[in-house]
Amino acid sequence: EVAARFLPFEIPSLSLAYLGKEEKGFYALVPSTKCSLLSFLERACVMDLDAFRAPLKTEDVARRGHLSLEERSNLYMWGYHRVLDSFQFHITLTDGIADAGLRALVGAGLRKALEGVLDAPLRIDALTLFKQENRNRPFSAVARLPFANLQTAREKA
């Protein structure tokens, strides 16, 4: 089990970012600095859990449009284009905001609402498994898988 191989860790702080192309982009929380433990966790999840993902469909490939060679390779190999070296951890906060004025207002509102959150560390202590029946349905949580703790790690050593 992937989760049992990790101890809880912290992302030192988060920043608010607008990711993607302007009209199709979205606001998200992203790590303020690179977090190696987060990268190790992502790689373990992608590689060790690949057998459990749904098969890649032709429409999934078409939907991605123009991808770099690395992203296209990731898509065919792992089922998603932004994994491994292309991975960027983010917590999505909004949908796409086409109107530039509204985008600026939403950004200002989020910065104000998140003042205490952006400087605080984010503790990562579990993986949560989600499923989606189809592209038109929301994701639903299936299971929360806690990381090991120091006592468990010492017992295994």
Short names for language-model regions:
Residues 1-157:
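Histidine-dependent nucleotide/RNA phosphoesterase domain, centered on the 2H-phosphoesterase fold
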